[in-house]
From Swiss-Prot:
UniProt GO MF annotations: ABC-type bile acid transporter activity; ABC-type glutathione S-conjugate transporter activity; ABC-type xenobiotic transporter activity; ATP binding; ATP hydrolysis activity; ATPase-coupled inorganic anion transmembrane transporter activity; ATPase-coupled transmembrane transporter activity; organic anion transmembrane transporter activity
Tagged with keyword ATP-binding: yes
Gene: ABCC11
Sugar-modified residues: N838, N844
Topological domains, Extracellular: 185-194, 292-296, 405-417, 828-863, 1071-1074
Protein name: ATP-binding cassette sub-family C member 11
Bias-annotated ranges (Basic and acidic residues): 504-514
GO annotations of cellular component type: apical plasma membrane; cytoplasmic vesicle membrane; extracellular exosome; plasma membrane; vacuolar membrane
Main subcellular location: membrane
Catalytic activity: ATP + H2O + xenobioticSide 1 = ADP + phosphate + xenobioticSide 2; an S-substituted glutathione(in) + ATP + H2O = an S-substituted glutathione(out) + ADP + phosphate + H(+); leukotriene C4(in) + ATP + H2O = leukotriene C4(out) + ADP + phosphate + H(+); dehydroepiandrosterone 3-sulfate(in) + ATP + H2O = dehydroepiandrosterone 3-sulfate(out) + ADP + phosphate + H(+)
E.C. number(s) listed in UniProt: 7.6.2.2, 7.6.2.3
Effect seen on changing M970V: No effect on glycosylation
Keywords: ATP-binding, Cell membrane, Cytoplasmic vesicle, Glycoprotein, Lipid transport, Membrane, Nucleotide-binding, Repeat, Translocase, Transmembrane, Transmembrane helix, Transport, Vacuole
Length: 1382
């Protein structure tokens, strides 16, 4: 029998996919989700039909119904188990974590993966918990007011009931911990000294001890389970709440992508730790009270000396933890900066490679890492000292108490001493909880203060009014709008832009892909006194110079700006096409549908009017082709047309088009304008922002913007009659068109990255198939299986300094354990000597009374050895902490630098197939594990594992039978551990891998806020975030529960060793000295908790090593491109002098599994020439640029520059001699000067000269900081046109002999473009200039024209020759462009 089941599984591209039998599709946030049918299995479930509205069943116990059902001791398994077995667990199953047993057993039979793992319980999912958090916060605000509302109280209320149960279990744990040592063990020892005792009584005592230890184990395990599940719920609620607050804004200017990742990985985890570990304070306090009372009754007032030593640990632990948190705060600042720079470098890797900036940027990141490492060492040293202090403090406290007690000549016998030590055992365990609890609470407190800003953040002000007049679509009345901040303080104090110098006070524009065009960094309003009325069905044309406020006008309609005065009114639904297209990871169809229903006829019509048919035929899988992160394998024109198709398919009433025709050639531009804008959108209201003036005469209304004001408004004929600036622009356009026979502001052709990858099938056939194509662009992230290989540990040890260093660390840990055990043995030996007046004698039926050790004549000697041992233990512990901290941080830094250098040296094909979010997961999430968690767990594992071995050796001294039984139990435990750790490893790996799609989703959401809001997909993106968060939380909860599942069972089995020792003490070892019996029983009581802790921390340590495994996996994937410098080969002095470029039978393909894109190119470009490169989509023109920079290596043939084969020299030697002006303008965070001259190779005067040549001097001079004006992430505080001008200034400053201009003036108005062309001719005089798909005026002025087709040279001659040549392809392109002007 089969049943319907839905799974949401994260995939490598940042979305969710399934693996199973497809039943149906569901579009959410541009990604596809499936419903499956699976055979009955452990997690099969019955299909549940939705209940009719208003008939939802009310649980009999209200909100506590599910929790109270858990109190039923045994609950029969339902016929169809719930998706999460925890929901149907009874009390016994819950306490023993037995609900997880079927899944653990299944891991032995078959492979665990996303399909076989049950989904997260609805009680733990984001939906339910974020609603509860919202409700609790609203209640808090209604009671106390917004100013006095406490997030901490909301947190406490969120977990109040569960906290009460946790406290009850903690008290049970404390009572059970004291019951055995104080009441039962003395009876067992007393029984062992009797000659004739009741056997049943003795066995009963031993089993009573065993039972009390089992109760202790169960109560402690249950307490952890409650805390972990509560923390998962709060984590889900907090994450969803923050994301909902973040995404409600249509533009976010106060948080960058790196900072967003840092918040959702850092602060959210701090809150998780606070909820999970904070309740341990209750156990610690209860332990302190119980131990103080019991110790006083055993030994008297001197017991408080030991208690005082433990009490001193608490403020010491708090102090050290606060120091660690403070150091961690400073470390986080540097870490955030490193992650931000890494994110930008990976995003702009193509530009960095073409400009040979790898070494300087690698040095910047390595310097940040070096600074981060120093802070990590400070933080790690405090953490390590805290950990070691808590391990040795019981020994030191015991030594101080014994020394003072004996110095006061107070009575102390073996029975009194070990009863006292047994009483302190509980405090010994509880003291380990102090730093965990204090750190969790301290970190969560600071996270709460930062998170409170999300709570207190008011919703954005929606100023757009709905018009009542149905004849009007848009109305501006005296509207003045600005980009001033609307959501200050949204991120934590460590991440604020102003404090980190990322943005100045005036930088208040959105950081997404909108690209507002007004003058950046201006403190005044960007739009002044706008008065505008657009009738319904009207096409409004918007023109103006670069930075005049055109894009800001659209942003004002989208409610992304701040309305200072006046009003804005809209009537009808909106569609928006941004200047820089926003693409969702997935396939083309998903991007166009954007969650809408698939209508084939309408879909085909949209493809036709947006001129996508031919592109889909060229793409390997048609519209099902995966287009990668940010549309990596598409040209700018293809991305723009997909964005336009999305808008047209959405069928809205008002269309906001931000220069959509700038990224397409003349033929395509004319087709889109005629078929899409004029025909398909007929009857719709269209606001068309454009630099292509030839289309404005078809607009019903035209406005000309200048400095944020409407300087001209009317129809085309009206404005021409006024003979104002608009008329001058049009006349200039026609004058140039007449003189050159052609004037076009659109591009000749566009740049594809998947050139010539044509299918034999037709478009219609490609649209009929729904099968997911294989061999897609984005590589699926491979997850290792099974246990970690020795190779992982070997590489980590090598990174740490080698095996010699590891042996030194191991020696120090062995010494710590030896001194700890020696302290126990020496005290036992000392007690055995008694008063020294009577010789040691064996027990012969009466309890041995060796007298008061304070009366021993050699008291000073025993005290000296005991005290020196404690001092030596402290010194060794401090030295061990220092060395361990240095070594572990050296290892993580070495792995970081090695990975980064390897990734940096990868070819571009690597970055085309690996999402940036996945790489950031390595440099952020995985590295954080190596820096923060792995050192803590590995140090604890070393100490505890050696301690367990030492305890077993001591216990074995009592009897070889105990050793035999202990060995058998330990072997069983080891086999048990090895069998089931596979499942635990799978859970941890899945949790690690599930972070990548979550990161990608956050990045994608921040980049596309405008489109998300305008298409009404906010709820879809929130839902997807919740699904991704629930997937991660599910794996995290299963990992935590599985470690507790194994730890509990191992602890129960080690309790059997305690039972065995008790039986042997009671019945079998009368010849053993009494003091050694007592010592053995006291030590073995620590074995159960120590052994399970060793196993659990061992699992945690191995889980943290999966981060090393992932880093090594990426290192293995990284195949370096050619060396930067060739040994034994150097470029001629002053090369290249002429700039002559020769292609000789050149063949090229992008990757091994892709078609050839350049076929036998034979071409000679003479030095100092300007060559225009044109051709249709897929012709291979952009591939020439890739070949010239050796971003792709040749299959055959070669390229010569001034007679030098470019493959015979290093990449840096080649690329440093070339310059590029890219199609997509790239600016990095920093200053304007940094973006133009990142490494201070030019003077300020030279930079100002370059800015003057690109007509930016006036704009930059307005800023108070001039060249040191800050640039936010992605250059978000500059318009796209301004970014283009800065990129041109960068190339001018570089002054190379060969220049590649790749569609560099697409987003610049025609007047500025004319000036820029003059600048390029003057600045690059004497250089070889290759102009790919530039405006036709520039191509006509070139010395030669190269026409590409199907990866071959079709034509190459002077423009005037090609224009007159019959049948010339260039002439046909010119004719098409000319017709677009008519």
């Amino acid at each position: 029998m089969t049943r319907k089941r839905t799974y949401w599984v994260p995939n490598s591209s940042g979305g969710l996919v399934n693996r199973g039998i497809d039943i149906g599709d569901d579009m959410v946030s541009g990604l596809i989700y499936k419903t499956y049918t699976l055979q009955d299995g452990p997690w099969s479930q019955q299909e549940r039909n939705p209940e009719a509205p208003g008939r939802a069943a009310v649980p009999p116990w209200g909100k506590y119904d599910a929790a109270l059902r858990t109190m039923i001791p045994f609950r029969p398994k339902p016929r169809f188990p719930a998706p999460q077995p925890l929901d149907n667990a009874g009390l016994f199953s819950y306490l023993t974590v037995s609900w997880l047993t079927p899944l653990m057993i299944q891991s032995l039979r078959s492979r665990l993966d996303e399909n076989t793992i049950p989904p997260l319980s609805v009680h733990d999912a984001s939906d339910k918990n974020v609603q509860r958090l919202h409700r609790l916060w609203e209640e808090e605000v209604s009671r106390r007011g917004i100013e006095k509302a406490s997030v901490l109280l909301v947190m406490l209320r969120f977990q109040r009931t569960r906290l009460i149960f946790d406290a009850l279990l903690g008290i049970c744990f404390c009572i059970a911990s004291v019951l055995g040592p104080i009441l039962i063990i003395p009876k067992i020892l007393e029984y062992s000294e009797e000659q004739l005792g009741n056997v049943v009584h003795g066995v009963g005592l031993c089993f009573a001890l065993f039972l009390s230890e089992c109760v202790k184990s169960l109560s402690f395990s249950s307490s952890w389970i409650i805390n972990q599940r509560t923390a998962i719920r709060f984590r889900a609620a907090v994450s969803s709440f923050a994301f909902e607050k973040l995404i409600q804004f249509k533009s976010v200017i106060h948080i960058t992508s790196g900072e967003a990742i840092s918040f959702f990985t850092g602060d959210v985890n701090y809150l998780f730790e606070g909820v999970c570990y904070g309740p341990l304070v209750l156990i610690t306090c209860a332990s302190l009270v119980i131990c103080s009372i019991s110790s006083y009754f055993i030994i008297g007032y001197t017991a408080f000396i030991a208690i005082l030593c433990y009490l001193l640990v608490f403020p010491l632990a708090v102090f050290m933890t606060r120091m660690a948190v403070k150091a961690q705060h400073h470390t986080s600042e540097v870490s955030d900066q490193r992650i931000r720079v890494t994110s930008e470098v990976l995003t702009c890797i193509k530009l960095i490679k073409m400009y040979t900036w790898e070494k300087p940027f690698a040095k910047i990141i390595e310097d940040l890492r070096r600074k981060e490492r120093k802070l990590l060492e400070k933080c790690g040293l405090v953490q390590s000292l805290t950990s070691i202090t808590l391990f040795i403090i019981p020994t030191v406290a015991t030594a101080v108490w014994v020394l003072i007690h004996t110095s006061l000549k107070l009575k102390l016998t073996a029975s009194m001493a070990f009863s006292m030590l047994a009483s302190l055992n509980l405090l010994r365990l509880s003291v380990f909880f102090v730093p965990i609890a204090v750190k969790g609470l301290t970190n969560s407190k600071s996270a709460v203060m930062r998170f409170k800003k999300f709570f207190l953040q008011e919703s954005p002000v929606f100023y757009v009014q709905t018009l009542q007049d149905p004849s009007k679509a848009l109305v501006f009345e005296e509207a003045t709008l600005s980009w001033q901040q609307t959501c200050p303080g949204i991120v934590n104090g460590a991440l604020e832009l102003e404090r980190n110098g990322h943005a100045s006070e005036g930088m208040t524009r959105p950081r997404d892909a909108l690209g507002p065009e007004e003058e950046g960094n201006s403190l005044g309003p960007e739009l002044h006194k706008i008065n505008l009325v657009v009738s319904k069905g009207m096409m409004l044309g918007v023109c103006g110079n670069t930075g005049s406020g055109k894009s800001s006008l659209l942003s004002a309609i989208l409610e992304e700006m701040h309305l200072l005065e006046g009003s804005v009114g809209v009537q009808g639904s909106l569609a928006y096409v941004p200047q820089q297209a926003w693409i969702v990871s997935g396939n083309i169809r998903e991007n166009i549908l954007m969650g809408g229903a698939y209508d084939k006829a309408r879909y085909l019509q949209v493809l036709h009017c947006c001129s996508l048919n031919r592109d889909l035929e060229l793409l390997p899988f048609g519209d099902m082709t995966e287009i990668g992160e940010r549309g990596l394998n598409l040209s700018g024109g293809q991305k723009q047309r997909i964005s336009l198709a999305r808008a047209v398919y959405s069928d809205r009433q008002i269309y906001l088009l931000d220069d959509p025709l700038s990224a397409v050639d003349a033929h395509v531009g004319k087709h889109i304008f005629e078929e899409c804008i004029k025909k398909t959108l007929r009857g719709k209201t269209v606001v068309l922002v454009t630099h292509q003036l030839q289309y404005l005469e078809f607009c019903g209304q035209i406005i000309l913007l200048e400095n944020g004001k409407i300087c001209e408004n009317g129809t085309h004929s009206e404005l021409m009659q006024k003979k104002g600036k608009y008329a001058q622009l049009i006349q200039k356009m026609h004058k140039e068109a007449t003189s050159d026979m052609l004037q076009d502001t659109a591009k000749i052709a566009e740049k594809p990255k998947v050139e010539s990858q044509a299918l034999a099938t037709s478009l219609e056939e490609s649209l009929n198939g729904n099968a997911v194509p294989e061999h897609q662009l984005t590589q699926e992230e491979e997850m290792e299986e099974g246990s970690l290989s020795w190779r992982v540990y070997h590489h980590y040890i090598q990174a740490a300094g080698g095996y010699m260093v590891s042996c030194i660390i191991f020696f120090f840990v062995v010494l710590i354990v030896f001194l700890t055990i020696f302290s126990f043995w020496w005290l036992s030996y000392w007690l055995e000597q008694g008063s020294g007046t009577n010789s040691s004698r064996e027990s012969n039926g009466t309890m041995a009374d060796l007298g008061n050790i304070a009366d021993n004549p050699q008291l000073s000697f025993y005290q000296l050895v005991y005290g020196l041992n404690a001092l030596l233990l402290i010194c060794v512990g401090v030295c061990s902490s220092g060395i361990f901290t240095k070594v572990t941080r050296k290892a993580s830094t070495a792995l970081h630098n090695k990975l980064f250098n390897k990734v940096f040296r990868c070819p571009m094909s690597f970055f085309d197939t690996i999402p940036i979010g996945r790489l950031l997961n390595c440099f952020a999430g995985d590295l954080e594990q190596l820096d923060q968690l792995l050192p803590i767990f590995s140090e604890q594992f070393l100490v505890l594992s050696l301690m367990v071995i030492a305890v077993l050796l001591i216990v074995s001294v009592l009897s070889p039978y105990i050793l035999l039984m202990g060995a058998i139990i330990m072997v069983i435990c080891f086999i048990y551990y090895m069998m089931f750790k596979k499942a635990i490893g799978v859970f941890k790996r899945l949790e690690n891998y599930s972070r990548s799609p979550l990161f990608s989703h956050i990045l994608n959401s921040l980049q596309g806020l405008s489109s998300i809001h305008v298409y009404g997909k906010t709820e879809d993106f929130i839902s997807q975030f919740k699904r991704l968060t629930d997937a991660q939380n599910n794996y995290l909860l299963l990992f935590l529960s599985s470690t507790r599942w194994m730890a509990l069972r191992l602890e129960i089995m080690t309790n059997l060793v305690t039972l065995a020792v008790a039986l042997f003490v009671a019945f079998g070892i009368s010849s053993t000295p009494y003091s050694f019996k007592v010592m053995a029983v006291n030590i073995v009581l620590q074995l159960a908790s120590s052994f399970q802790a060793t196993a659990r921390i061992g699992l945690e340590t191995e889980a943290q090593f999966t981060a090393v495994e992932r880093i090594l996996q990426y290192m293995k994937m990284c195949v370096s491109e050619a060396p930067l410098h060739m040994e034994g080969t150097s470029c001629p002095q002053g090369w290249p002098q002429h700039g002559e470029i020769i292609f000789q039978d050149y063949h090229m393909k992008y990757r091994d599994n892709t078609p050839t894109v350049l076929h036998g190119i034979n071409l000679t470009i003479r030095g100092h020439e300007v060559v225009g490169i044109v051709g249709r989509t897929g012709s291979g023109k952009s591939s020439l640029g890739m070949a010239l920079f050796r971003l792709v290596e040749p299959m055959a043939g070669r390229i010569l520059i001034d007679g030098v084969d470019i493959c015979s020299i290093g990449l840096e030697d080649l690329r440093s001699k070339l310059s590029v002006i890219p199609q997509d303008p790239v600016l990095l965070s920093g200053t304007i000067r940094f973006n133009l001259d990142p490494f201070d190779r030019h003077t300020d005067q030279q930079i100002w000269d370059a800015l003057e040549r690109t007509f930016l001097t006036k704009a930059i001079s307005k800023f108070p900081k001039k060249l040191h004006t800050d640039v936010v992430e992605n250059g978000g505080n500059f318009s796209v046109g301004e970014r283009q001008l800065l990129c041109i200034a960068r190339a001018v400053l570089r002054n190379s002999k060969i220049i590649l201009i790749d569609e560099a003036t697409a987003s610049i108005d025609m007047e500025t473009d004319t000036l820029i062309q003059r600048t390029i001719r003057e600045a690059f005089q004497g250089c070889t200039v290759l102009v790919i798909a530039h405006r036709v005026t520039t191509v006509l002025n070139c010395d030669h024209i190269l026409v590409m087709g199907n990866g071959k040279v079709v034509e190459f001659d002077r423009p005037e020759v090609l224009r007159k040549k019959p049948g010339s392809l260039f002439a046909a392109l010119m004719a098409t462009a000319t017709s677009s002007l008519r």
